[in-house]
Amino acid sequence: GKNMTAYEYGGDILIVDAGIMFPENDMLGIDYIIPDFDYLLDKANRVRGLVITHGHEDHIGAVRHVLEQIPTPVYATPLTLGLIEVKMARNGYNKKADLRTIQAGEKIQIGKFQVETFHVSHSIPDAVGLAITTGAGLIIHMSDFKLDNTPVDGWATDYAKLAEFS
């Protein structure tokens, strides 16, 4: 749980995922736990975007909490973005969020980061991995995935794209 990664390059910051963790049984009175993103608060003006890899709570559950303190564009695939919108509305987030739809296979520039998304199989449809390119090199951010060549949603992991990156 609490999946959240921050990449820094050339003065820019890119956040990937913002999830929650559900408490252990002995954590009475706690509904959920969010990532500690205090490090980013005094650097909020350098955050260029938040990319979400898929719609599970451990990857989207803290989006509202991040946006309340670090207003930044949120990039996600259609299903994932829909889940985020519903969750934010249900939880009373009434600020106008900058939500941007991306498709698997798309390349986008977010500050100094070029982000290319690619299909990955997972237990939820519309999941993507990320190829993040900077002047320092390439980062493959896989997030959650499974090896399944016949997924229910018909979108197997894009092994050819992964081979291109290697």
Language-model features: locations:
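His/Asp/Glu-rich metal-coordinating catalytic cores
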Residues: 1-51, 56-166
